Every structure is written in structure tokens, then in C-alpha cells.
Amino acid sequence: MFPLPTTRDDVYLHAPLFEEKITLDSIFSAISKSGHDVLLLGGKLSAATRKRAADFGLELIDYYCREELQIANAIPTTEGAIALAMQHFPYTLHHSRCTVLGYGRIGKILSHTLHALGANVCVVARKESDFAWIDADGCTPVALGNWEQALTNCQLLFNTVPSMLITEEQMRLLPHDAILIDLASERGIDAQSAQRHGNQVFWALSLPGKVAPATAGCIIKDNVMHILQTAYPPHHTTNSSEITHKN
């Protein structure tokens, strides 16, 4: 089982606490030469890394891309984002004006939790069906093409969309004391533009492992166990109960 992420450059194993660099090819080669039937598990795998493993005749499964893991991870991500906001926001979240960009896994749980804390929440989304869900959850739906009002009144902005949405044009609409928290894997907020306008901006990545490492580990463990139980059903010589007992 490889770490999360398995690699950042498709060449070396991601092992920041280990002094030496370990190439993925050296690992794949050693496993391939062992002659054993091995199931490899990794996280955030690129197509290039999966192809490289296949070149060595190995099966490499991405445990991070499973929908149930992504949904479960959205909970500690939400808690971490709110903790970050509370640390830097000089007011209570109760009655605060929050804007959430995107209504995917994180956007859904984040907007719901902010609303439960008493915040006034606008959610910027694209789909008409999302607007109905946002409204049913007690938040205000805003279309992406008509979101100026959601920016001009915003005190806390949370981005969940991995695409550059907040540029110089949008920054002019935001209050100078608005706090911006970017939760997307690829930046959705122009940090330099935000700093020029005097706004605090935080690119908050890998929050589950930072704010709730035990929970993050359990989420990965549960999904890995499900993969193993699927790959090695009870009729297999290594049954699911043996796998659970060993762990």
C-alpha cells in the first residue's frame, strides 16, 4: 500500500520524512521480480503512474478516487475550514455572511454546516437541480453568472472549485476585510490579487490529515478494507475475517 499521494512527480515515491529518494520503478521492478500475485494500492494516482505499474505487469488501484472516501473526507475538510475561519475571523460565524463557491461533496457539507451554525450562506452553483437542494437546505442559491451580490456582501468566502474563479475582476467586488479560504486542489483564488486588495487568503490543502489525522486514517483504512474484501471474497484463501484480524 502506497501513501497519499503516492507520488507528486510520477517518478519518486512521496516520502517527505525519508532522506533518500525512492523511484517508483525500483519498487515496481522488485515486486514484479518477486513472482507473487500482488495487489497494489495507492492514492491520487495519475494515468502515467498507473501505466508505469502496468508496464511491469502490476495492478495498481487508486483507493482515493472512491466516492465513499471523497464524501467521508469532506467532513474533516469542512471542520478544518471552519476552524481556520474561526481562528482568523473577528466575529462569530452566527449571523456572518458566507459565500461558498461550488456545490460538490465539500460544498454540500460545508454550506449545510455553516447554516447550522447560524451563518447566512450563499452558495454559487451551476445546476438548476442544485439550486433546489441549496434552497431546501436553508441556504441562498446563486447562479455563477449572477454572483456579484454574493461577493459584495461577503465576509467569508470558501472556494471548493478547482478552477480560477476569483481574479482581479471579482476581487474588486469583495470587501477588503473579507477572508478567503481556498479548499480546492488547484487554486481557485488569485492569491496575489487578494493580497493587493488587502484580503487575507488561505490555501488550505490536506485538511483531513491536519485537523483529524486519526479520522483521516480510519477513512482510508475502511476503504482499503472494502477493496480487499472485494478483491479477496470469502471463498479466497485469504478471507475477509483474516484480513480484518491481521489489521
Report residues per predicted region.
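Residues in the short beta-alpha loop(s) of Rossmann-like NAD(P)-binding domains
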Residues: 46, 126-127, 184-186
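Residues at the starts of beta-strands that form the adenosine-phosphate
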Residues: 37, 97, 119-120, 200
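Phosphate/diphosphate ligand-binding glycine-rich loop within oxidoreductases
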Residues: 10-77
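Glycine-rich adenosine-cofactor-binding loop
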Residues: 94-115
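Adenosine-phosphate binding glycine-rich loop
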Residues: 53-95, 186-247
